[in-house]
Swiss-Prot record:
GO terms for molecular function: 3'-nucleotidase activity; 5'-nucleotidase activity; exopolyphosphatase activity; metal ion binding; nucleotide binding. The lineage of its organism: Bacteria, Bacillati, Cyanobacteriota, Cyanophyceae, Synechococcales. This is 5'-nucleotidase SurE. Its cofactor is a divalent metal cation. Its EC number is 3.1.3.5. It is found in: Cytoplasm. Binds 1 divalent metal cation per subunit. It is an enzyme of class 3 (hydrolase). It holds the Pfam family SurE. It comes from the Bacteria.
Amino acid sequence: MKPLKILISNDDGVFAEGIRTLAGAAAFRGHQVTVVCPDQERSATGHGLTLHSPIRAEKANELFGKGVSAWGCNGTPADCVKLALNEILPEKPDLILSGINHGPNLGTDIFCSGTVAAALEGTLAGIPAIAISIASFQWRDFSFASQLALEIAEEALTKNWPQKLLLNINTPPCKSSEMGQLGWTRLSIRQYEEQFTRRIDPRGNPYYWMAGNAVKDIDSAGDGPSQWPSDVAQIESNSPSITPIEPDLFWRGNISDLPAINLKNYFSR
């Protein structure tokens, strides 16, 4: 296939090994690669935008290999993609990749994910987009995930890529020789035990550190073909997952299941 114009972003920042590996792999395959990503760690920022302070971007080519044009931006992941599409890039890219994230983006955790938000900006702009994550904060070999994402993108772009489709890929933290088959999955619904650590600052005022542990994964039966496993189950079986996502959050249950609100009792004020 002809070389692609690829925009790459992330939420781990411009110094993260995951994005540098992905950008290098894309350039090695002959693609035209531009990186526009946060200049620092921006994990768990979701789809936040910077509206009350200036957004700045500086060249960061020296952090990447040959053939990669890079920018570090002081904004959120979503800011970075918006800025790239509207100011930095001379023309619309063929593909947006976000990652490789240092840690999983599974189930309903995607609502907090800056990685997925960056890819979603591409989807909203009508550009094919993929978010890529490794399901471990300790695993540091990003080569397999890079090749997997690029091969999937190259194949999918020669076939049918529906409008509003975002692909969310997670790979297990193990060698490729130990992995099972890549499979289509649906989002799990994750429930957490929230934890806050309360501390006192030198002025005697309390402050908090937030953490949490996933205590339950609810299989989201009915979302996608019923025979598909959840993304969490797929990763737990040491197999890579690929989950199709769209930005339309409209509820698709039965009308009879909605609360029986008498709408005629309400009027416009």
